[in-house]
């Protein structure tokens, strides 16, 4: 048995027509493996002319998987979060995205930016109020880097002298340094967490997301087709408005899109996504388009369900009525225990819940599971996620009021309905990542809720499949409660919560 590397991803800046031809040639060589009589290198498989012809013929016969051997990475800078969410819903990809926790974000409008700065301060103060020791370890580390063996400790964000190891002058300098430099450092954990929560007020179409996205030559061409399927459900009302709006990235004028199905004006959400997908599809067409690699299964961006361009999407039939507001009061009355009549838990499962755009952006990183979004952008009122650290305070009303003031821009706190489906073995993998003190809070809480429903159905006898029960028992801790990541795996990451507090924290 022999092993030989035949292909390798290399770094490049831009893609030339020659590189695209090389990609097609390599795919054509792989197509020849299926029927070669001799070895790979000593046969007609690697003949350039035959390989090129073979690529075209194989693709025209509908066998496109040969183009999956070529992986192409695109760096998207200044992208919207929504475009990243759509691309990350496709499962066949690798992505590296600049984190909202470690990045000071800016909104598209002054309204968003003002709210982001305001809530970043509020969240920071609230974090320190709830967890006064949250920054202590980092504060001490930074202090000791300049003043080692100083005899000081840090407790609740304050310097505490344990031993008088410094002379009077140095001691004064050290205290001033701690107060004026270290305590003002916006890279402290509390500030990073504040930034992570403040991004909820920014539009899902805030163009400050940067990520590298890798997938195959085939998939890039399918993405082009799915972009076109979304785009082709709309038509600009006036061509000149469309041109002006497109050239200025939506900063000048207004472009009105009309649905070809209903004649109704497209919402802000639909219009922004239209231009995002238009720009992406234009880039693909200019750099990676291969005529023979058209999607021959008539698919779409399944994640978008009824917004995908498929007028009567099959997932439209999933019962989500339990998440609708009360017809009289307008209140949302569902609880974490709420289940749709279509939810099912077994070896394969499907479950529904509501989630913010921030949450679903995290959830999609579990690529072995599939997610479907249900969102009506034309509703006059939307539900918003409220960070648990605000619950029970006067901030809740202010938070909701501020979000309502920018609701037309679709802030990332906007909640949508999600249907999650997959195999329980893959859900276990999700639990091993997300039932953790380091995981984003909203997805950690929902993962815990879904795990609890599996345990409930085993305990009640609703799940009888022995294989499924064996998987579910992996989630059960010694006390019968849900295990955390550090109890399921040998976790080496630093964490201030531990297994005891990971699932009950408020930040």
Where are these regions (language model features)?
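A conserved ligand/cofactor-binding region detector
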Residues: 1-507
